[in-house]
Every structure is written in C-alpha cells, then in structure tokens.
C-alpha cells in the first residue's frame, strides 16, 4: 500500500535552505509554496525532500509533518485507521488527497495519494 516515504525538514531560513539543497547538494526544485516561498519540494534522481520554513521566530509554531508517505489508496488507509487520531482525507489544490495521523509522541505523519 505504501509506495515511498519523504522526509520533511524544518528550516529557519528558506532561501538559505533552498541554496543549500540546490547549489550544494544538486537537487532541483519541484514546487514551492508561499509568497515569498517558504516551502519547497526538492528532487534528485529518485530522492525527494520537503523543506518547510513556514514558522519564523515571530510566528507561533504548529505541529508540522515529520514524514510524508505516498500511498496508492488513501481512502482504504483512512478506513483502516478508523479509531486513530486522523485528520482527513482531504483533496488539496496541489493535486494530492491527504490525511494526517498523529502518533503517540505527537509526530504528524502525512499520507497522500496523487489525484492530479
């Protein structure tokens, strides 16, 4: 049912993180979010990394995803997780149908199915 997992990394300074991932490590930018950009999806070969700088020093942080998992059938997963602390599934504007599960330690794990 799972097809891949993607780490979600926090960054204090998105432009600095973007430069590191692209110029130092050679990743390409797949998508970015925010204006100015504060979230990016970076790709190299078959690897993908999400970098999230949504919460600056002057913002109150909310729990962020800790990992992102691609799945083939999000609705079947939602049914299997009945009774767990689950948010969603919900269709997103970026072409994914996602749900979030919170583990016993408060880590938010996002599962998504491509619906684009």
Which residues make up each language-model segment?
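Conserved short beta-strand elements that form part of the metal-binding/catalytic scaffold
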Residues: 28-63, 108-113
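Short glycine-enriched loop/turn motifs at secondary-structure junctions
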Residues: 1-3, 59-64, 93
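Short secondary-structure junctions
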Residues: 26-32, 84-88
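Residue-level marker for the onset of beta-strands and adjacent loop->beta junctions
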Residues: 5, 36-38, 65, 97
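Amphipathic alpha-helical segments
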Residues: 15-28
């Amino acid at each position: 049912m799972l097809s891949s997992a993607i780490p979600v990394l926090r960054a204090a300074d998105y432009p600095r993180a973007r430069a590191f991932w692209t110029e130092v490590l050679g990743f390409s930018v797949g998508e970015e979010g925010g204006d100015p950009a504060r979230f990016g999806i970076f790709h190299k070969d078959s690897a993908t990394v999400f970098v999230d700088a949504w919460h600056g020093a002057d913002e109150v942080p909310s729990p962020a995803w800790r990992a992102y998992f691609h799945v083939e059938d999000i609705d079947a997963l939602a049914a299997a997780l009945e009774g767990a602390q689950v948010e969603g599934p919900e269709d997103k504007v970026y072409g994914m149908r996602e749900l979030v599960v919170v583990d016993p330690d408060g880590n938010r794990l996002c599962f998504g199915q491509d619906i684009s």
